[in-house]
């Protein structure tokens, strides 16, 4: 029969690309799990009282090309002016070799956080490069693998300063009055919950206050003046006050390292090393401290260890500081970093090398000197006599100057009294400087770049002598080897080949939702209309961004059942913090500041108690019953006991145990009965979208992991986005911003991140996903995630017991496999199974969370039956291998599991094992073979012999 045009115009094509199993595969999988249809399966699993009566109003699906065209038109409403606003954001020139081989390479952007180091050596090496850059430029002993942004890093520096301070009674933190305003904003917010008093003043005034435990200084002040704080920091040290210094990464190429001048903590944004402004992010922050304070440091740290063969290998070091282990006692609640952006920044340093960076920084500074000379010659007054790249110029009529600049397509800094600010960057040209002369001096300025360059006296130093760097930087061979594009391309390829990402295999990590990051979703993030905007540009230049964000927020309101969405949080953990802050502020507005107790089920993710502690709350643990559900009797008792001190409950749904708890609405009602609020963690939203909503269930606030449910890639450990949805009564208490007004959100609250819309440039990814899926496609995605998980549970339950199930023996979108009985009977652990999966070509599931001795598997909707069967077959084959150990065929200390993973080097070495080489490295054939570059890591050695810098080239695997 001939098809009509309407039938041939298939708008749902992307849905079929995104969802892995075909219709026929779905039917087969349904028959295996014993369900007649997807809808019937959902009715068996999801409590009837929380299922939505009608679909969310997010529209129908459109094709990839239609969505791209629609978004391109929206992006076209953004105006690409030359922005010299500065304030921590600058235009960059990302090397195309990095753009193509890192940012646009799924081998880099689809990987997960490197908890499994054997399949992560490439990006771990890249992060070690980033740490080495940080150490060299800051002059400190230890660097982290990045934080979320500069302002967040400042807040973390304050918290760390308090942890390491010997002045235990001091509760004041001093902030110099020339730090960036957005930094001060975020620091104030963090201090609010810690009970610290923020004192702002001239830097030298810090010595007048005996109750100060730490001081925040900025080496290159927000208006451009350079500061030599050596004497001040020496005086502070004598008084046991901790010195924290914010620094510009490009300026540090020419300026003295703050660590050499006495700073205890140094941080800043690495954005200038090749990462576009992107209307605020994502960007990596660098963070460094002295070795003696290493255990108080926030964020991830990459360290050098060795593998089972004694070879050098890399891993995440000192994880016992982090929230997934220490919970409310963790140094920070942040469980992500900005790995993809840190790797771009690190590779920028590798590609340019020390001489290239000096040339770039020197050119920026020289152009600034030329600009200053011309403006002075033209009769204008500069507020400072020292600078790296930023000038503050006194003007008679600021509004006239700003208006004239706009007519030239130029943005100047506009928030200074009787002055404008100009920050130059690596993209600035001679022609740009001439345009600035025309703006400030008139078209007939008569200035010549060459003449000004020649006229600048060598003895007139705009960088004070005491601030000039004299030591070598980036002397390690990795920064002096890959300067041709051929060598750089091959280096990046070698690193990517060491890692296991979604471009090679399914990553079945429970609680992580490693779904497809479609090419059509990724394309817009490199469009200059999105990439080049300054976050503090005039709002009329960002109409496209505002429209896109407004549409996305509206869709998320529909998909969550809330009344408003705040896009500011840069990660899920930051979203938790922001949501809990909203609850805290709501109680305070009702004169109920005594509500400080946060109920958290024992099954919760470690981020929950860490976030509660950061929000100034005290954690009370609620028990779970033998089925893994919240114990309602215990909940009632603890809610009643808390009484007027009850702030909220933090609950995940479906639960962290992988089931839909039947009593979730009753949980909400109990907490509300005693005056508390319900924080529903959005980690498992991939099993809710289109089926139910947190708002419909009865929650008051949630964060959404856009890097899980809504397709932003994990980037190897960041970026992420954690916007929060709130009911109307909490909307006035979500984060605001002191630099940029956030339209549509009625709040005067402090910020939690540096930019008003967080990592705005990756929001188009989620916009594209929702637009191409539509309401029906989004529901199908949730249904298929649930089917895939139940298919795995059904096929594996005889070999590996499923620890928790809900009604009718079903699971939600993930399942927990109990390895404890196997370990007791055979000695083979969940670690052994995880490492053996590498030989089969798979990333391990989540180990020992939320229950020790288990593996949690989440397949997502994007994996086909073929790939899922391959995983199941691997798990069943491993079960057979365990049987052979149990039967004595292989000794417990020498078998394919305890020796896993196996490397190519082993294959060609002497072989004395009781199993064959072929079984070791090709247990499932060679088609999907992944070769790990190292054997199992020695974690104990790595932490006992902490080394977090680049190793000699001869040590690289």
Curated annotation (Swiss-Prot):
This is Glycine dehydrogenase (decarboxylating). GO terms for molecular function: glycine binding; glycine dehydrogenase (decarboxylating) activity; pyridoxal phosphate binding. The glycine cleavage system catalyzes the degradation of glycine. The P protein binds the alpha-amino group of glycine through its pyridoxal phosphate cofactor; CO(2) is released and the remaining methylamine moiety is then transferred to the lipoamide cofactor of the H protein. InterPro entries: GcvP (IPR003437), GDC-P_C (IPR049316), GDC-P_N (IPR049315), GDC_P (IPR020581), PyrdxlP-dep_Trfase (IPR015424), PyrdxlP-dep_Trfase_major (IPR015421), PyrdxlP-dep_Trfase_small (IPR015422). HAMAP family: GcvP. One of its GO terms (biological process) is glycine decarboxylation via glycine cleavage system. Pfam families: GcvP2_C (PF21478), GDC-P (PF02347). The modification N6-(pyridoxal phosphate)lysine is found at residue 708. Keywords: Oxidoreductase, Pyridoxal phosphate. It comes from Pectobacterium atrosepticum (strain SCRI 1043 / ATCC BAA-672). GO terms for cellular component: cytosol; glycine cleavage complex. NCBIfam families: gcvP, PRK04366.1. Belongs to the GcvP family. Its cofactor is pyridoxal 5'-phosphate. The glycine cleavage system is composed of four proteins: P, T, L and H.
């Amino acid at each position: 029969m001939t098809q009509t045009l309407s039938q041939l115009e298939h708008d749902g094509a992307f849905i079929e690309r995104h969802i892995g199993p075909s219709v026929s595969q779905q039917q087969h999988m349904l028959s295996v799990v014993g369900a007649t249809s997807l809808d019937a399966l959902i009715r068996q699993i999801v409590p009837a009282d929380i299922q939505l009566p009608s679909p969310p109003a997010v529209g129908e699906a459109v094709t990839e090309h239609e969505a791209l065209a629609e978004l391109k038109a929206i992006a076209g409403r953004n105006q690409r002016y030359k922005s010299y606003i500065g304030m921590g954001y600058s235009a960059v020139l990302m090397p195309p070799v990095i753009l193509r081989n890192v940012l646009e390479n799924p081998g880099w952007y689809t990987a997960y956080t490197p908890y499994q180091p054997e399949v992560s050596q490439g990006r771990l090496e890249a992060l070690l490069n980033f740490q080495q850059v940080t150490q060299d430029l800051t002059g400190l002993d230890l660097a982290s693998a990045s934080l979320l942004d500069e302002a967040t890093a400042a807040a973390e520096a304050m918290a760390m300063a308090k942890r390491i301070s010997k002045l235990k009674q001091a509760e004041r933190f001093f902030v110099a009055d020339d730090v960036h305003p957005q930094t001060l904003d975020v620091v104030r917010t963090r201090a609010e919950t810690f009970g610290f008093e923020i004192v702002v003043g001239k830097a030298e005034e810090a010595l007048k206050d005996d109750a100060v435990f730490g001081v925040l200084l900025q080496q290159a002040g927000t208006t451009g003046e350079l500061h030599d704080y050596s004497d001040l920091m020496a005086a502070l040290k004598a008084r046991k006050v901790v010195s924290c210094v914010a620094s510009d990464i490009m300026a540090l190429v020419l300026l003295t390292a703050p660590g050499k001048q006495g700073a205890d903590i140094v941080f800043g944004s690495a954005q200038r090393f090749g990462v576009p402004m992107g209307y605020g992010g994502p960007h990596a922050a660098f963070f460094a401290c002295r070795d003696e304070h290493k255990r108080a440091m926030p964020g991830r740290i990459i360290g050098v260890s060795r593998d089972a063969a004694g070879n050098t290998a890399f891993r995440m070091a000192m994880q016992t500081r982090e929230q997934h282990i220490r919970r409310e006692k963790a140094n920070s609640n942040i469980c992500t970093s900005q790995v993809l952006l840190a790797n771009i920044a690190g590779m920028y340093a590798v590609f340019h090398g020390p001489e290239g960076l000096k040339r770039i920084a020197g050119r920026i500074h020289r152009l600034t000197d030329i600009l200053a000379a011309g403006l002075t010659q033209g009769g204008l007054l500069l507020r400072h006599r020292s600078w790296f790249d930023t000038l503050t110029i006194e003007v008679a009529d600021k509004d006239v100057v700003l208006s004239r600049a706009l007519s030239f397509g130029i943005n100047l800094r506009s928030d200074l009294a009787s002055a404008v600010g100009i920050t130059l960057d690596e993209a600035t040209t001679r022609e740009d400087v001439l345009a600035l002369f025309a703006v400030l001096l008139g078209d007939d300025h008569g200035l010549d770049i060459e003449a000004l360059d020649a006229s600048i006296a060598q003895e007139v130093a705009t960088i004070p002598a005491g601030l000039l760097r004299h030591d070598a930087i980036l002397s390690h061979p990795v920064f002096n080897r890959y300067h041709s594009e051929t060598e750089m391309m091959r280096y990046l390829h070698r690193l990517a080949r060491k890692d296991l990402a979604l471009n090679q295999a399914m990553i079945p990590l429970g609680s992580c939702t490693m779904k497809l990051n479609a090419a059509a979703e990724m394309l817009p993030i490199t469009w200059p209309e999105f990439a080049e905007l300054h976050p503090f540009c005039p709002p009329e230049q960002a109409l496209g961004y505002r429209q896109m964000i407004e549409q996305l927020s509206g869709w998320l309101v529909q998909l969550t059942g809330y009344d408003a969405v705040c896009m500011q949080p840069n990660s899920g953990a930051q979203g938790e913090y922001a949501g809990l802050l909203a609850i805290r502020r709501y109680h305070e507005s009702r004169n109920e500041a005594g509500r400080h107790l946060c109920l958290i089920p024992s099954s919760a993710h470690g981020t929950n108690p860490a976030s509660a502690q950061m929000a100034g709350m005290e954690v009370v643990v609620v028990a779970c019953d033998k089925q893994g559900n919240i114990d309602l009797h215990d909940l009632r008792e603890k809610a009643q006991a808390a009484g007027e001190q009850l702030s909220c409950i933090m609950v995940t749904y479906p639960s962290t145990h992988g089931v839909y708890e039947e009593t979730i609405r009753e949980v909400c009602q109990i907490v509300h009965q005693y005056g508390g609020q319900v924080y529903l963690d959005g980690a498992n939203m991939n099993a809710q979208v289109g089926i139910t909503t947190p708002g419909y269930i009865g929650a008051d606030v949630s964060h959404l992991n856009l890097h899980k449910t809504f397709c932003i890639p994990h980037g190897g450990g960041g970026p992420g986005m954690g916007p929060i949805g709130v009911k109307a009564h909490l909307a006035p208490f979500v984060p605001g911003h002191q630099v940029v007004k956030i339209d549509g959100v009625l709040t005067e609250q402090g910020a939690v991140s540096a930019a008003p819309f967080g990592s705005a440039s990756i929001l188009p990814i989620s916009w594209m996903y929702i637009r191409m899926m539509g309401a029906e496609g989004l529901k199908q995605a949730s249904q298929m995630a649930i089917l895939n998980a139940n298919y795995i549970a059904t096929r594996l339950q005889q070999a590996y017991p499923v620890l928790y199930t809900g009604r009718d023996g079903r699971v939600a979108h993930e399942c927990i496999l109990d390895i404890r009985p196997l370990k007791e009977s055979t000695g083979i652990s969940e670690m052994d199974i995880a490492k053996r999966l590498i030989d089969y070509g798979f990333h391990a599931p989540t180990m020992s969370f939320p229950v020790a001795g288990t593996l949690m598997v989440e397949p997502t909707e994007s994996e086909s039956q073929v790939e899922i069967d391959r995983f199941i077959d691997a798990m069943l084959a491993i079960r057979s291998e365990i049987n052979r150990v149990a039967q004595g065929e292989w000794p417990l200390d020498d078998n394919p599991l305890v020796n896993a993973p196996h490397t190519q080097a082993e294959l060609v070495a002497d072989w004395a094992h009781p199993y064959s080489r072929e079984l070791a490295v090709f247990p499932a054939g060679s088609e999907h073979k992944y070769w790990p570059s190292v054997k199992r890591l020695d974690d104990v050695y790595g932490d006992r012999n902490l080394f977090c810098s680049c190793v000699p080239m001869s040590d690289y695997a």
